[in-house]
Amino acid sequence: MLAAVIHRHTVPFEPAISDGIQTVRIRAMPFRLLSPAHWPTWLLIAVAFFVVRLPIRYQFRLGRLIGNLLHRIGGRRTRIATQNIELCFPDLSAQERARLTKQVFESTGIAIIETAYTWLRPVDALLPRVRFHGLEVLQTAVNEGKGALLVGAHFAVLDLGGAFLAAHFDFDCIYRTSRNSVIDHISLRRRNSLYGHVIERSDMRGTVRQLRQSRTIWYAADQDNGRQHSVFAPFFGIPAATINVTSRLAKISGSPVIFMSHFRDESDCSWSVRLRRVEAYPTGDEIADATLMNRIIEREIRSHPAQYLWLHRRFKTMPDGTRKY
């Protein structure tokens, strides 16, 4: 989930109380981030600084090369992606699944560059390349004055998609950090400039308070966070641990739920952002709500199957305790 699991020993941030909520604000960069242990990361960032200034078509080409390299190297993420695709697309032949796995890595390579672009450059120059569908849907929800839950998933264009929408709407996000301190510093600094508040996942009261103050809050609802915070609902026909926070927040706050998806089109170097209202939600049944949300996510994935983060362990927690990976 695009949520704040804060690793206090690695993250150069400070919690701040703002309007009654605990937000994540970046401090000035600690000198320890300049230690030799972090030089490889800084070198990659320096390279990325120049890469994101290339023409978009060359950024896409380079991203595909990076993805192919990661795929050839193999390792744990390749095994996870391969297993996920076998589980979710059993009707594909072995050759088709292998081709899709390769495309997933190519898309992931492009996403790495897109994420670097989001962190290192303003996205204004890309906005003419973005097709928005449903901006009026979100505007209508905001006008109701009950706040809005902007629910997403880990499609490839995650950070860039949020930045595109932030050019049109003021909203907050729930944030999950990386274990890399330098990456955390850069990404959190950028998110603080893009969004109204960057909220810790643990601050549920603050999240509800923001909704009641008519704020829109964005987060991803498609990762396996274990049994404690989940119910089991079908995802591609497989019972998957699915967070129940969306159902609970919608019930407590009365906020409308908007689903956001975002994809790239390599044929013309463009992107699309789609916003759709989730009707008749919540139902009062958390499993039914989770099933509906998974169905929506699955439908969007099927439209662009290579542009989903199949590299994460979506089926890490099983109802019977078995292991898929």
Model feature map: region roles:
Residues 79, 177-181, 239-243:
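Active-site metal-coordination segments of metallo-dependent hydrolases
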Residues 21-152, 186-189, 193-195:
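Membrane-anchoring hydrophobic helices of lipid-metabolizing enzymes
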